């Protein structure tokens, strides 16, 4: 047994000559003189991209007082006709309309500092999802009913794709005054 261990260690200890011609040694970086100059000699700024006069008409969203809610929240409140067009779009894509409502229209945390179930991301569903709905007036009628029942709550319409199991669209249909 000892002789077999000696033979195996002797075979491992044998080292061949090092091959130095495999990789060329590092000689440092090349001189920058060999590279062509790509800089302009003058400081001509006329070729730089610019949004020019459009800067004066841009506005910044004020961080206080105007909260952004969902899709289309930067627009004025949607009229009944505008809501009907959005719901028609939702129905044309074969999405299931759902109506939800909440006292707070944005994500908030009052129970814990980390995100969880009760942080305002989940709204209460108004009745059941409207499977089989084919007319926008049915959805608008349900929104009006939710507004009458809860006038101080936000009401939103979501479009749910039951084939992919995802929410595809969501927008505020009613904001309390």
From Swiss-Prot:
Residue span of the annotated presequence: 1-56
SMART domains linked to this entry: RuBisCO_small
GO aspect biological process, one term: photorespiration
Subcellular location: Plastid, Chloroplast
This protein's UniProt keywords: Calvin cycle, Carbon dioxide fixation, Chloroplast, Photorespiration, Photosynthesis, Plastid, Transit peptide
Miscellaneous information on this protein: This protein is coded by one member of a small multigene family. The basic functional RuBisCO is composed of a large chain homodimer in a 'head-to-tail' conformation. In form I RuBisCO this homodimer is arranged in a barrel-like tetramer with the small subunits forming a tetrameric 'cap' on each end of the 'barrel'.
Quaternary data: Heterohexadecamer of 8 large and 8 small subunits.
Name of the protein this chain belongs to: Ribulose bisphosphate carboxylase small subunit, chloroplastic 6
Organism: Lemna gibba (Swollen duckweed)
